[in-house]
Design a protein with these regions (language model features):
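N-terminal transmembrane-helix/juxtamembrane module of multi-pass inner/ER membrane proteins
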Residues: 1-63, 96-123
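Interfacial segments of alpha-helical transmembrane regions
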Residues: 7-15, 66-97
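Aromatic-anchored segments of alpha-helical transmembrane domains
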Residues: 22-26, 86-95, 162-174
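Hydrophobic alpha-helical transmembrane segments
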Residues: 23-27, 55-74, 135-139, 146-150, 168-172
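Membrane-water interface at transmembrane helix exits
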Residues: 36, 71, 92-100, 147, ...
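Membrane-helix interface segments
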Residues: 46-47, 74-78, 151-157
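Membrane-embedded catalytic cores of phosphoryl/pyrophosphoryl-handling enzymes
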Residues: 114-214
Length: 214
């Protein structure tokens, strides 16, 4: 069933797999500091304006709002989306608070560095609980779910682009390392697939025309 979902939603999962491979190889051949500097040096005024807003697409409040909007059309679809949010958030929170509670964010890690990092003025940047990225976890869970629910499967790449940009924003804004966003994306995507597998038949029974396509 998992392979069937991946095959049906190829427009999302194929480019996502390629993204995982490319970024994974980069992490094997470069340090997190090098990757951070690579992203940081590629800053621009337009990006400084864009990413502080784009990053809110990974905020839990935004996820809940989308769940409520989905519930207006189909209550069970809304509940399934919320279950994805709950599972992905729970996994991310447990890792942050109990397993990797001492993980430092870039600001704290490089506070004595001689390298002049570009940091957007007025931005509230955190220092602790870096791994994994909660925003990236939530946004991949959300847009992964939207890709699965969309009957026009060819648009899956669109949801992936939005999710990837939101994840990239966490590194650009100096809130997370690449590895934080990388693992967060996996947690979010896997959580959505698990919830979808467990609940899509239940959703289909409620209103056949709103049945998630597998």
């Amino acid at each position: 069933m998992v392979f069937r979902i991946i095959r049906t939603n190829y427009a999302f999962f194929l480019p996502y797999l390629l993204l995982l491979i490319v970024v994974g190889v980069l992490q094997l051949t470069r340090s997190q500091e090098q990757l951070m500097q690579w992203v940081n040096v590629r800053n621009a005024p337009a990006a400084d304006e864009f990413f502080p807003y784009a990053t809110y697409l990974g905020d839990g409040v935004f996820f809940v709002i989308v769940c409520l909007l989905l519930a207006i059309n189909n209550r069970r679809i809304g509940l399934m989306a919320f279950a994805s949010f709950a599972l992905s958030s729970l996994v991310s929170l447990c890792l942050k608070q109990f397993v990797f509670s001492n993980s430092l964010r870039p600001l704290k890690t490089f506070e004595h560095s001689t390298y002049q990092y570009h940091i957007i003025k007025g931005l509230d940047i955190h220092s602790y609980n870096s791994f994994p990225s909660g925003h990236t976890t939530s946004d991949f869970a959300l847009f992964g779910m939207l890709a699965l629910l969309d009957e026009r499967k060819g648009r899956g790449w669109f949801f992936l682009v939005i999710a990837a940009l939101t994840g990239y924003s966490r590194v650009y804004l100096f809130q997370h390392f690449v590895e934080d966003a990388y693992v967060g994306s996996i947690i979010g995507t896997v959580s959505t697939v698990v919830v979808y597998l467990l609940m899509y038949r239940w959703v289909a029974q409620y209103q056949k025309k709103d049945r998630p396509t597998v």
